[in-house]
Each structure stands twice: as C-alpha cells, then as structure tokens.
Amino acid sequence: MPGGKKVVPSGSSSASPNAAATTTAAAAAAAAAPHSGTKRLETTEGASAQRDEEPEEEGEEDLRDGGVPFFINRGGLPVDEATWERMWKHVAKIHPDGEKVALRIRGATDLPKIPIPSVPTFQPTTPVPERLEAVQRYIRELQYNHTGTQFFEIKKSRPLTGLMDLAKEMTKEALPIKCLEAVILGIYLTNSMPTLERFPISFKTYFSGNYFRHIVLGVNFGGRYGALGMSRREDLMYKPPAFRTLSELVLDYEAAYGRCWHVLKKVKLGQCVSHDPHSVEQIEWKHSVLDVERLGREDFRKELERHARDMRLKIGKGTGPPSPTKDRKKDVSSPQRAQSSPHRRNSRSERRPSGEKKPAEPKAMPDLSGYQIRV
C-alpha cells in the first residue's frame, strides 16, 4: 500500500482506497462469475452503449460497459471521499451479496497486504519477444479492475508525454486497471524497444442488445504482429508476435469474440506511436475505421492489409511516429540527432540542390568568427 494514500471517509473503515480497491477487485470477481457462465463478455474502452460516435475519451461521468454503468475517478489520487463512497455504493449494487461484502471489507482491520508487482527491467541482450512476455505478465499481475470505477482518467487528446506521466503513476500505485489503461501502460513499458512498432486496435461488438468496446495495443516486430492488453478473457488480451499479417491478428480476435457469441461490428486502427516519452504529439487512435458488415469479408481483409501497408510506408519515409519528435529535437541539437543526421544527409545526397549547398557551409564560419571578433 503506497504511503500517503490513506483516505478515511466519515463513518467508514480506515482502510485506504488503494488497498481496499485492490481487495474489492478480487471480491467483485464473484459478481462477474454469473456473467461468464452465460458467456456474457463485458470488455470496453469506456464508451457508452447504444451510442456509436460519441467522444470516447470524454463522455459523461456515468458511462456504460455493455449496459452496465461504471464510473471514472476524475479527481486523481488519493481518491476523494465522494468518489470513494460512490465506488462502494456501486460495488454494493453489482455484487450478489450487496452491501454485506462492502461492509465486510471496509470493516476489516486486518486486510491482507497486496504485493506490488515489480516493473520489468531488461538486459540489452534480452530478445524483444521475451520483453513483451514480461510486460504482459506485469500488466496481468496488476489484475483487472472489477470495482466499476476506473482509477486513472485517460484523455485521448492529451499529448503523449502527459499519458506517459500517467503510466508512470500507474506503476507507482499498482492499482487494478482496465483495457485502455493497459494500452497506455503497454506503450510506456515498450518505449525502450525501438525495433517494436506499437499501434492501438479498438473493437466494437454486439451481444444481447448491447454494444461492447475493447482496446489492445497492437505490436509489430520483425514483420510479425501481436498485441498487449488487459481483459476478463485470456484470449482477448495478449497475442505473441507470431501472426504473419495484421488481418490474421484481427481475425484471431474476431474468432475469440465468436466463442463467446459476440458479433464484431467495427474495428478502429491507429497509427504507430512514437517511442519518445517526451513527445508532444497526440496518439492517432483511429486512422482507419472499418465497418465489418458493410465491407464484407474480403474487403475487410484488404482494408486491414492496406492499413498495415500504410504504416510501413510512413515509417519507411520517415513520416511515421518519430517525425514530430525529430523536428522538435533538431532545434535542440541533441546528441542523438547528431548521430542520425548523416543518415538523413545520405538519403538526400541524390538531390543536386542540397549537395551544392554543402560547400557553402564552411564559408559561413569566417563571417561568424568576424562577428565574434567585433564583439
């Protein structure tokens, strides 16, 4: 239990929100068990059911997860009293034992100490697939958040640097998370893998009169696709980088949805995310929005491969995720940019005008020296 996070609501126990929230996640798992018995899946990105094009990152305070309301902690940590009480009221509504389970946990004076997972660290020689397994293992150890209250508010319009600060806070607090939080955390934990491309993949499915939303972090390493993520179901989260094409990866998720009687309606694919944690660019969450029913099977597959090809072209041309960071770093004259500059010059050496301008650079030095002498 991290220090300094203790909140004591009036008339409640002295258990801290962080420790009790983690305990509540385990207790609320019993409430989810009946749903799994009827093959009801409730994974979501946080958008309201029955409404298709609303802003997913903003929305209302009372959002819906496949028809079941859930809340977002917009006050940060430590959790304020109003959010704390609202969470417990919601737990009492969705748990089979109602208020009894809430009173039992909040009234306990000897809550077990929840172990805090260690953030994975890697040797330079550790293969990327092994690193991905370690990252996914860490995400899984945080556990899925069953409380009905998302602890970290994620605004998709925030610059990448702000989202990375939030991910760092997730590792510090070690609270249960949902799928969107897992994507941000996955980006943060893979920033040190420059040969790994990361991009968001969102799913919208339909089951029993309700829409469900889910998101994972797609990855591409060595031409093979995989994914990192968090879900109530094992086959809707981690996928090792073993799929030859993007369409194979997405269709594998569709098959997993089919096993729990969900119909895939839409897939949203984002562009590759920069590896610079200080980048001020925004994540492009939905570069391609694919309507599965309208496209048909063959066109759906073609559009997936078209998106994959577009990502490769942007990275190859240098217009992919690192571009805004490169332009920003050129003004700062960082050592890293100086090392990569010769590569850019070589790529431009075929252009005659730029080649003719190079000899003019030393001529500018005497003028600069003369200016210094005059001063």
UniProtKB/Swiss-Prot annotation:
One of its GO terms (biological process) is negative regulation of lymphangiogenesis. Residues 1-69, 309-375 are annotated as: Disordered. It is found in: Cytoplasm; Secreted. Keywords: Carboxypeptidase, Cell cycle, Cytoplasm, Growth arrest, Hydrolase, Protease, Secreted, Ubl conjugation. It catalyses: C-terminal L-alpha-aminoacyl-L-glutamyl-L-glutamyl-L-tyrosyl-[tubulin] + H2O = C-terminal L-alpha-aminoacyl-L-glutamyl-L-glutamyl-[tubulin] + L-tyrosine. Ubiquitinated in vitro. The active site is at C179, H214, S231. Its EC number is 3.4.17.17. Its main location: cytoplasm. InterPro entries: VASH1 (IPR028131). Pfam families: Vasohibin. Residues 53-63 have a biased composition (Acidic residues). Residues 1-33 have a biased composition (Low complexity). Residues 347-361 have a biased composition (Basic and acidic residues). GO terms for cellular component: apical part of cell; cytoplasm; endoplasmic reticulum; extracellular space. One of its GO terms (molecular function) is tubulin-tyrosine carboxypeptidase. The record marks K39, R40, R86, M87 as: Cleavage. It is an enzyme of class 3 (hydrolase). Residues 329-375 are annotated as: Involved in heparin-binding and antiangiogenic activity. Tyrosine carboxypeptidase that removes the C-terminal tyrosine residue of alpha-tubulin, thereby regulating microtubule dynamics and function. Acts as an angiogenesis inhibitor: inhibits migration, proliferation and network formation by endothelial cells as well as angiogenesis. This inhibitory effect is selective to endothelial cells as it does not affect the migration of smooth muscle cells or fibroblasts. Belongs to the transglutaminase-like superfamily. Vasohibin family. Interacts with SVBP; interaction enhances VASH1 tyrosine carboxypeptidase activity. This is Tubulinyl-Tyr carboxypeptidase 1. It comes from Mus musculus (Mouse).
